[in-house]
């Protein structure tokens, strides 16, 4: 029995990333992704159940990093924070905004895939869902204050 070619994974993901960024999820074709990666569709289906699972693989790291970042910020015990620190948390400081921009830039392709290219996937409402999630976190934070 032959061993799976690990190089195929990287080629498939890179090809899928290019096609999804260029055409969006709905217009990207698995045949084109496979042709550009120089693999058969059978090789793709040995690794992924379909196009959406391939898309999931591309955005998984970005989603995980977003959740980790949110968890770190939301996990602060408000009873141990000074009034000055609480007031500062509401200020959109230059450093805070630049930190968020740097985060987005470091995960640029993942964000573009989620915000602009995800129609037809379970992430099709990512921007709305993300804003609603952040609003709920802020609301809970206010309730606890």
What is each stretch, according to the model?
Residues 56-62, 126:
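Alpha-helical DNA-contacting segments of helix-turn-helix folds
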Residues 112-115:
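Short, hydrophobic secondary-structure boundary micro-motifs
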Residues 30, 60-67, 71:
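Short, basic, alpha-helical segments at the C-terminal edge of helix-turn-helix-like DNA-binding modules
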Residues 91, 95-106, 120-145:
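Amphipathic alpha-helical packing segments from all-alpha helical-bundle domains
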Residues 57, 71-105:
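Hydrophobic alpha-helical connector segments
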Residues 11, 15, 19-53, 57:
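Helix-turn-helix
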Residues 1-5, 78:
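N-terminal intrinsically disordered/low-complexity leader segments
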């Amino acid at each position: 029995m032959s061993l799976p070619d690990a190089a195929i994974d990287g080629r498939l993901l890179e090809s899928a990333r290019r096609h999804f960024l260029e055409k969006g999820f709905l217009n990207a074709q698995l045949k084109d992704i496979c042709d550009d990666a120089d693999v058969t569709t059978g090789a793709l289906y040995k690794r992924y159940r379909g196009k959406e699972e391939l898309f999931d693989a591309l955005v998984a790291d970005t989603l995980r990093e977003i959740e980790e970042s949110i968890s770190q910020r939301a996990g602060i015990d408000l009873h141990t924070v000074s009034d000055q620190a609480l007031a500062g948390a509401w200020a959109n400081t230059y450093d805070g905004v630049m930190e968020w921009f740097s985060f987005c830039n470091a995960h640029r392709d993942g964000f573009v895939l989620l915000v602009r290219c995800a129609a037809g996937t379970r992430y099709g409402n990512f921007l709305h869902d993300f804003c609603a999630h952040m609003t709920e976190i802020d609301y809970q934070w206010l309730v606890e204050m």
